[in-house]
Regions:
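Short secondary-structure capping/junction motifs at helix and strand boundaries
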Residues: 86-87, 149-150, 171-172
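Short, conserved, surface-exposed binding loops centered on an aromatic residue
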Residues: 40, 102-105, 144-145
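Short, surface-exposed acidic-centric catalytic microdomains
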Residues: 62-130
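C-terminal capping/extension of enzyme domains
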Residues: 9-10, 14-39, 43-44, 55-57, ...
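N-terminal nucleotide-binding beta1-loop-alpha1 segment
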Residues: 49-52
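Hydrophobic alpha-helical signal peptides and transmembrane signal-/tail-anchor segments
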Residues: 1-5
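Internal catalytic-core helix/loop-beta-alpha segment
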Residues: 109-166
């Protein structure tokens, strides 16, 4: 009975864990938005995905990274790791399976945050080109919390450019290529790289199957 009580307690904690940064949400005013999510940084993370900034909250279907139901990030991850683009999709509720996503990312060592901690939206949409960076993220502070990190992954032009500026990376990598991040090694002395992937946004003109192939190549490279 004690065992099942512990299981129920664990499930309850998993279901009620909040990834919202309530302090940042409260600070957001006069057109400046502070990042509404806390960094998701599993201690075993080898990959850190850095976007630009979450879309407006009205577009969210869950309180986590890549929350827009029409963004295909979680469909890509489902296809890469489980051969099923709908593995993390709850079609009836039109949302993603948050508990499954969190457990998966913790197991695989996949971390998430964004290259901007505070932004101003020049238009009321999710397009990166209408984001003004007010406060870039302290990327070095994130890296310091990820001793096994091998790659920072960006999937958009804005995020890539912001990261290159922040980390003094002299050349912006083309899509599906990577470059070393200067003076950045993990705890094993391995070079940390910036790997640029195609955007998971449906506005990016590439078939989902091609995006899946690109993401699979990246994960395969890091798992060698």
């Amino acid at each position: 009975m004690v065992f099942f009580s512990l299981i129920r307690t664990f499930v309850y904690m998993e279901q009620t864990t909040s990834y919202l940064n309530k302090e940042h949400i409260a600070r957001s005013h006069h057109g400046v938005e502070y990042h509404p999510l806390i960094p998701f940084l599993p201690a075993n993370a080898k990959v850190l995905f850095l976007g630009s900034f979450p879309p407006p909250h009205k577009r969210w279907c869950m309180d986590f990274y890549y929350p827009n139901f029409i963004n295909d990030h979680w469909r890509i991850e489902g296809a890469v790791f489980f051969g099923d683009r709908n593995y993390f999709v709850d079609e009836d509720a039109k949302c993603f399976k948050l508990a499954d996503i969190v457990a998966f990312c913790q197991e695989k060592g996949i971390a998430f945050f964004d290259t901007s901690t505070a932004i101003r939206r020049l238009q009321d949409n999710a397009s990166d080109k209408f984001l003004e960076v007010v406060e870039p993220t302290d990327i070095c502070a994130l890296i310091a919390r990820l001793p096994q990190l091998q790659a920072i992954v960006t999937t958009g032009e804005k995020a890539t450019e912001t990261l290159c500026t922040s980390m003094n990376i002299p050349s912006i990598p083309k899509v599906n290529t990577y470059v070393p991040i200067p003076n950045t090694l993990n705890s094993h002395g391995q070079q940390v790289v910036l790997y640029r992937l195609p955007s998971s946004s449906r506005a990016y003109p590439l078939a989902l199957e091609k995006k899946v192939e690109a993401y699979r190549r990246m994960f395969d490279l890091l798992n060698r």
